[in-house]
A protein has these predicted regions:
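Basic, polyanion-binding surface patches
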Residues: 1-191
Length: 191
């Protein structure tokens, strides 16, 4: 297989596109974020990268935020939240989001999203064009119909990713390739 040398870029398959929520000037605001991920499993922490000029970043000053995982059926609303600024548009009203709160009053959550994480800011790293916000997950809410045997089911959640590289489109998950920590046994066992 021939390889070509490309310019340095973070060409890692992105995790799901999420809607990051903050309270800005007393009102809930959401923005679409593609650069996010799991930062730690214990304590549970997630990371989101937000451009310095984004309005949502003002709400991070409250030291609380939410990560809402939208399903494929609200891709238009999610995309809209990445196209317009909350400084100019009430995205909650425009998208008809039903907002609720858990114990963190500065971490607005979206009812229409099957998974919601309420987070407290643990660290903020200045990286260049973005700030990396590390948040400790305080609460996790999952829509009951998106569970199978009491566990979140990706086929029911229907997350989607932001396609990077030659295309900038959203993609849903495809078929299963095999069971984790099992399919590799065809090569050998764990030591």
């Amino acid at each position: 297989m021939k390889k070509i040398l490309a310019a340095p870029q973070p060409l890692i398959c992105t995790p799901p596109t999420v809607l990051v929520g903050t309270m800005v000037d007393g009102k809930p605001n959401f923005m679409a974020v593609a650069w996010c991920g799991v930062a730690c499993s214990n304590p549970p922490m997630v990371s989101v990268a937000i451009r310095l000029a984004r309005y949502t970043l003002k709400g991070i000053q409250n030291r609380e935020f939410s990560v809402n995982i939208p399903s494929a059926d609200i891709v238009k609303e999610t995309d809209y939240c990445g196209m317009v600024s909350g400084a100019e548009v009430d995205k909650v009203a425009a998208c008809k989001f039903d907002v609720f709160y858990g114990q963190l009053t500065n971490a607005p959550l979206i009812e229409q999203c099957p998974v919601n994480l309420a987070c407290k800011v643990a660290h903020i790293l200045n990286l260049g064009t973005h700030q990396l916000i590390i948040g400790q997950v305080i609460e996790t809410h999952v829509t009951e119909s998106c569970l199978t045997d009491g566990k979140p089911d990706l086929n029911k959640i229907q997350p989607f990713v932001y396609g990077m590289g030659s295309t900038t489109e959203y993609y849903t998950l495809g078929k299963s390739l095999g069971k984790c920590f099992s399919v590799g046994r065809e090569i050998g066992t764990r030591k």
